[in-house]
Amino acid sequence: MTRTFAGRLLIATAACLLVSAPANAALAYVSNEKGNTVTVIDTDRFEAIKTIKVGQRPRGIEVTKDGKFVLVACGDDDTIQMIDTKTDEVTGTLPSGPDPEFFSQDPTGKLLYVANENDNTLTIIDIDKRTRVGNVEVGVEPEGVAVSPDGKIIINTSETTSMAHFIDAASHKIVANVLVGSRPRFAAFKRDASELWVSSEVGGTVSIIDPAKHVVTKKISFAIPGLRAEAIQPVGIAITRDGSTAFVALGPANRVAVIDGATHEVKKYLLVGQRVWHLAFTSDQKYLLTTNGISNDVSVIDVAALKVVKTIQVGELPWGVAMPEP
């Protein structure tokens, strides 16, 4: 009898572990810049289920590779806060520079590269040890950060300098500076590292860079009937895993551009909420979530159908959105 009960208990415990382990796998996290909160969204139902209080002016946001923490850049607190994904509470901080805005992890999930807008530096942080291990001087107003798929190159975009800086991950030295459009905001590698895409908010373009040669091979421009050119401001970029399609948030144009990953031609514009800023795929890449700062909501795009299927109300001035990696 005892042995049978113990066996049942062991099976039940194992089942609980299997259910609870990926508890955050279907969740999305949205940083609300003016609300000083993070909204948690259930991506199975596409509903906001919780609001987490964080520091002042949260912007950049990512889930750690192991899924244990959500990292949030709290610019006015000069720190990166760590939200425990099991408790949804802030349990620690990481030491950034002044006014951290955006960051990216290396492929191992051990290092974090943080753009500090106010002192023109990129801070390198050991996530497990919660210590600063490096600092790189970059251009004026550093913003976007991307890491090459092999982890060997870090990209930082500097808004005022209008450059994408190529930084060697081993030496922490800048190895190339590539001039792009005015006020570059975001950088994203294709999964095969064949291309680097950089959005330029004021320039109104996306530059395609050959990462090996450090040269711009093409600039993508946008034109939307009825909108002035200055209203079209590219910011966030999301590229499908196979590289076939890219989505670009166009800020106050209230559109997301759908771009052919091979030809670099704009295929379609999707109307979303007001001032769309950043975007991220669900883990299966069937849906794309966009943060719409002025309308205080998130648009859900069906990637196959290329249409908005739902709008989710979140906090005040949503900025970034992040989900666990598959």
What do these predicted regions represent?
Residues 14-326:
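Predominantly soluble domains enriched in secretory-pathway, periplasmic, or organellar proteins
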Residues 1-11:
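Bacterial N-terminal signal peptides that target proteins for export
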